[in-house]
Amino acid sequence: MARRDMAAETMDPRASTEPSPNEPREPARYDHAAVEPRWQRAWEEGETFRAVRSADPARGKRYVLDMFPYPSGSGLHVGHPEGYTATDIMSRYFRMRGIDVLHVMGWDAFGLPAEQHALETGTHPADTTARNIATFKRQLKMLGFSYDWSRELSTTDPRYVRWTQWIFLQLFKKGLAYQDEVSVNWCPALGTVLANEEVIDGKSERGSHPVYRTPLRQWMLRITAYADRLAEDLRLLDWPEGTVAMQRSWIGRSEGALITFEVKGWGKGALSVFTTRPDTLMGVTYVVLAPEHPLTTWLTSAESGASEPRREAVRAYVAAAAGKSDRERLAAAAREKTGVDTGLVAVHPITGVEVPIWVADYVLGGYGTGAVMAVPGHDERDFSFARTYGLPIVEVVSPDGSLHDQLEAAYVDPGVAVRSGEFDGLATEECKRAVIARLEALGRGKREVNYKLRDWVFSRQRYWGEPIPIYFPVELADPQGDPRKGAAHTIRYDQPIAVDEASLPIELPPLADFRPGDDPAGPLARAVDWRFFQRDGKWYARETNTMPQWAGSCWYYLRFLDPQNDAEPFSEAAYDAWMPVDLYVGGAEHGVLHLLYARFWHKVLYDLGHVKHPEPFAKLVHQGMILGEDNEKMSKSRGNVINPDDIVRAHGADVLRMYEMFMGPLEAVKPWQSGQIQGVVRFRDRVFATCTRPLSDAMDDATSRQLHRTIKKVTGDIEGMAFNTAISAMMVFVNHLSSLPSPPREAVLRLILLVSPFAPHLAEELWRLTGHERSLSYEPWPTYDEAFCVDDVLEIPVQVNGKVRGRVMLAKAASEEEARAAALGLETVAALAAGKQLKKFIYVAGKIVNIVVG
């Protein structure tokens, strides 16, 4: 079947979405269990939300995207739909504003969690993933989200894997994907490398297995080549300030100097250190190496000529450091610093003075050069270490140029150079420039920009991930041997070969035993018939490491543009139609890794000419976490997880949607409170009852003013994603309409449209019951007349026993009797006053209503 160009379709998604006209039109009550599935079927059968880009550029477009979920075995809990509901409200609102909308959903289905779940349940991850996706999809459809399901994708789909591997090959060809021996947290029991965050007290967070620091061959992505642009282009984005700050900190750009110290007795002659304070160079009293530094490794060998006791002391210290993660090392160093004297000395690049070289684990091999020049007078870590081991502490920067014989603490602020020879008297910034100039003249240093950001360790020694599309030559001891049958061989990892693009995707073999082992080659090494192959009489071996879970999520927003395209990842027409992503919503926990990696891949594709924008996500919003009723994070272990199926069964999807939006600001952390759901149920039922009463063709001035004020308020709040206050405004308006003998038809119809993004099933049903035959999904959004909004009607807070319990709309000239009737008509007030004596009623005109009951 020919591929459909999704950017150019012209079908009318509004057609044929109404339920059968034979269904009852005047129900006595609102039955969510019957109404909601009926409208979900109507939307699906009519393809109501199929994304269609109009040929009219005046319509505009919005690409509204959720961070797609990892489909876990437990399905959704009520915290998951919060962000999805927010994007659905925005998508429905944009459609009604006449804007073309792309709103899609897919599955981030590869990775360690899926594989561990499969191992624990004794099933294959392909089977568990398929079941989990089915559960998630059922739940999302149950909640009435307006996704274009024709674009659904999964990162495990071979058609998707093909293009993930294709992007890797572009990175490889550009020199951005390479192999290196790096020190990693290796867990033999889990059979994979762990991040620092996954190691606690030398053991894995999952399963408490021993973890060791060891060098392993890894595939790396050269994200550092894009460090400057990743930092600079943050200014282009409408993102939360906290997330921008996190990314800047993670990238960690710093300016300083790279300085060379000669090492006596070392064959390589010198080591380099980076410092942001070259002005303190004259205060160096020792140099510190990370346990992983090549000089440290050389020192433990017989080649170094060091005494056996000295070598053994260094060897033991390095071994102890290998059992700790970087995080543990830094935490331990904050309490008590440890180290060992190597017996080697470094030569100061300007004075020629010899200073001792130590090994200490507060210096990390993965940061900077893995060596630091220690200036204890002006660095707190160095000061503590020098105090512990009796090393000299020299003041070379003074606040005002005066000298101090003894320092009680490191002075770390700018000042004036002292005891610095030719640099004495120079202010800090001037001294930095002078020291760098002197080093450059001597050929022993230069100005340098450094980053905390490290290249991305990309490979995983697990089964459930995208195979890396690389293979290597195999050298056989016996030319007639077969490596699949155990013939002695050597794999030439130093000669990586890219898989031909026409051969993609390279799919995972159906491996029955995919358990990890202590072999760093990973489980795929056991699939010998898959791993080894012959071509032109020569043997080759496939790469057996797989990609991390981050790979598929780095570019999924692009595949959504054109998911059925088998000729390219996405067409230019599809890209031009929808990119960039206008609104991206997801958890703040992804503020660094996923978002940084996706930006990196996008910039590579930008440089290669495949995309036309330097950044993929124009606006980013983080929804706040919904806690359990115990104010703790929802988890099965705490027993505080609330299943959305139960809420929908009892009250309906619209109630769940509105309750989650009414709980508080979208970005706020908030606890689930089951007792408050009934208030939203009453609001829904009151909307239904009000809109199904006999309607009037006339509208009084007070209702007209309140209608226009409500439209303005709800419109502005949706634009600002302040959904809780939008719902509150509608509640106030419904209270007003319900007090009328016969609500105006015009006001009711506009109310239905206002409610529809929040409670779409209810709105569709009411739209049908008020005589409309087609879905309201593309009806024009209500407009307001500013003249009706600037008048003498005010929103007045109502206090009961000192606490604000609601708000009423009153004219400035309203009498106390009118204020009393409006305030006591509020549900919340009536409930609090029920069965109690009204002791006091105070109305401050235009300001507040205060009620005291007891």
From Swiss-Prot:
It is found in: Cytoplasm. GO terms for cellular component: cytoplasm. It is an enzyme of class 6 (ligase). A motif ('HIGH' region) lies at residues 69-80. Residues 23-32 have a biased composition (Basic and acidic residues). Its main location: cytoplasm. Residues 1-32 are annotated as: Disordered. Pfam families: Anticodon_1, tRNA-synt_1, tRNA-synt_1_2, tRNA-synt_1g. The keyword Calcium does not apply. InterPro entries: aa-tRNA-synth_Ia (IPR002300), Leu-tRNA-ligase (IPR002302), Leu_tRNA-synth_edit (IPR025709), M/V/L/I-tRNA-synth_anticd-bd (IPR013155), Methionyl/Leucyl_tRNA_Synth (IPR015413), Rossmann-like_a/b/a_fold (IPR014729), tRNAsynth_Ia_anticodon-bd (IPR009080), Val/Leu/Ile-tRNA-synth_edit (IPR009008). A motif ('KMSKS' region) lies at residues 633-637. One of its GO terms (molecular function) is ATP binding. The keyword Repeat does not apply. Gene3D superfamilies: 3.10.20.590, HUPs, Isoleucyl-tRNA Synthetase, Domain 1. Keywords: Aminoacyl-tRNA synthetase, ATP-binding, Cytoplasm, Ligase, Nucleotide-binding, Protein biosynthesis. This is Leucine--tRNA ligase. It comes from Sorangium cellulosum (strain So ce56). The lineage of its organism: Bacteria, Pseudomonadati, Myxococcota, Polyangia, Polyangiales.
